[in-house]
Every structure is written in C-alpha cells, then in structure tokens.
Amino acid sequence: MVFYKYSGSGNDFLITQSFKKKDFSNLAKQVCHRHEGFGADGLVVVLPSKDYDYEWDFYNSDGSKAGMCGNASRCVGLFAYQHAIAPKEHVFLAGKREISIRIEEPNIIESNLGNYKILDTIPALRCKKFFTNDSVLENILTFYLIDTGVPHLVGFVKNKKLLNSLNTLELRALRHEFNANINIAFIENKETIFLQTYERGVEDFTLACGTGMAAVFIASHIFYNTPKKAILIPKSNESLELSLKNDGIFYKGAVRYIGMSVLGSVFENGCF
C-alpha cells in the first residue's frame, strides 16, 4: 500500500487509494503516529465514485472519522490531478458535501467548503468555570459556535501576544464541553486575522486547521464586519486566503508534495 504525503498551510496528510470502502481507523492511527508510523495530521482514502470524480474517507490521526477537512481538501485535489484521477477543475464528495477544486498554478489550489451554519452565540459567563486565574480568555465577552463541516468554537482576543499564552487545559475543557474544535483569534486589521486552534482528533494545538480558519473568517465577517475576503494566518504562519462567494466559503493557498512511503510491517500489527 502506497502513501503520498502532502502539506497545506502547515497541515500534513497521508493520501492513499482504495477501490473498496472499509474501515481504515486502525490504519490511520498507525501510519499517522509521529514516532511509530509515517507521521501526519490525518489519512485520506481516495475512493471511486459513480457521480463525482472521486470521493474520500477522512480520518484524524487518532483514527476518528471526520466529514470535512479544509486543508486536506486542497491536498487531495492536487493529488488527484497529479495522478490523473481528475482534471484541473473537478468535484469530489466529502461525506455529504460536494467539494469543487480548481488548480490555478502548479501548487496554488482553491477549494470550496460549501455552506456554513451559525449554531449558537455563547456568553463567556457560560465558560468562566473552565478558566484559570489570570486566564487570557477572561476578556472574551462572547464565543461563537459555527459549523463549517465540523463544529468550531470561536473567540477573539484584543492583543495578538495573548495567542502565545493560551492554556491547553482550558481549551481542552472547552473542547469537551461543546464537543467542538476551539479557535482563539486576533483581528490585526480588516483583511488579516491570526489564530490558534485546539483540534479534536489531534487533542492539542495544531499548526493549522482549514475548517477552523473558515469558522474564524465567518465569525469575524458576521460579528466584526470584516470584508468578504481575508488572509488567515495560523500557528504555522503559512497564510491562506479565504473568501465568501454566494454564501459559500472558498480557500486558496499553496500545497506541497512531500514524498511517498510504502506500507510494510504495519500489516503485522493488526491494522486490518
């Protein structure tokens, strides 16, 4: 079994093909492990589709499945084109979402996330019990729960330096309380937003999270009146352009092909 490793906005993914749909949860945990496997934020299994150029099953590094991953969608789009699975402009199925891909330059990929849903606005008082003394989150008045394929809780701080002082235990508690990824962001100006994401499945801060960047983008646009196009800068410092077109969210940014790996003794460890 051959795996191709790609990176987008600091997220890295292993991509493989299968002609048969089955549970790859154990395989994902094994191959994504940073010390005992190849190491990646997630596993993408590309599958044939009758109605689309292809479809995928996406697994987080802990083996859990997710319907959508924004940065992985751009990576798999480039993979599909480079391996003659699909043309430069194509559509694939991610869970129940149709994802369109457009390759603008050799490594600049645009993908659409589709529609979003504002699930709730949450007064910070509901979250105070999770904060430690002198928490950097204490000055956040409102959190926003937004579904961009997966649920995200978004809060904005007033000082960029606070993004480097976030408490992992606080964010982990919020993650379990709301069963959502946690995003803390700072709006530097109307078109530039910095953020940090504590991600489900990774259970820690992640270098980037495409759906999290989308949730921050939407929250800033709706509640802070930022424009319909902005640059989002995650922990990796690899920026991503997000835009809103006809109520759909679009990503555009660079994707890198890293290399290829071949599965060996992992079969002996009970992955299947």
UniProtKB/Swiss-Prot annotation:
GO MF entry, a single one: diaminopimelate epimerase activity
According to its UniProt record, this protein's enzyme class is: isomerase
* Pathway(s) served: Amino-acid biosynthesis; L-lysine biosynthesis via DAP pathway; DL-2,6-diaminopimelate from LL-2,6-diaminopimelate: step 1/1
Locate the coiled-coil region(s) and give their ranges.
none
Identify one Pfam family in the record: DAP_epimerase
GO biological process: what's one of them? Answer: lysine biosynthetic process via diaminopimelate
Q: Which UniProt keywords apply?
A: Amino-acid biosynthesis, Cytoplasm, Isomerase, Lysine biosynthesis
Reaction catalysed by this enzyme: (2S,6S)-2,6-diaminopimelate = meso-2,6-diaminopimelate
Subcellular localization is given as: Cytoplasm
- The UniProt record lists the EC number as 5.1.1.7
GO terms for cellular component: cytosol
| Residue numbers annotated as active site | C69, C209
What are the binding positions for substrate in this chain? N11, N60, G70, N71, N181, E199, R200, G210, T211
- Which chain regions cross the lipid bilayer? none
Q: Where in the chain is the site Could be important to modulate the pK values of the two catalytic cysteine residues?
A: H152, E199
HAMAP family this protein is in? DAP_epimerase (MF_00197)
Name the family: Belongs to the diaminopimelate epimerase family.
On subunit structure and binding partners, the annotation says: Homodimer.
Name the NCBIfam families for this protein.
DapF (TIGR00652)
What this protein is reported to do is described as: Catalyzes the stereoinversion of LL-2,6-diaminopimelate (L,L-DAP) to meso-diaminopimelate (meso-DAP), a precursor of L-lysine and an essential component of the bacterial peptidoglycan.
Kindly provide the name given to this protein in its UniProt entry. Answer: Diaminopimelate epimerase
The root-end lineage is: Bacteria, Pseudomonadati, Campylobacterota, Epsilonproteobacteria, Campylobacterales
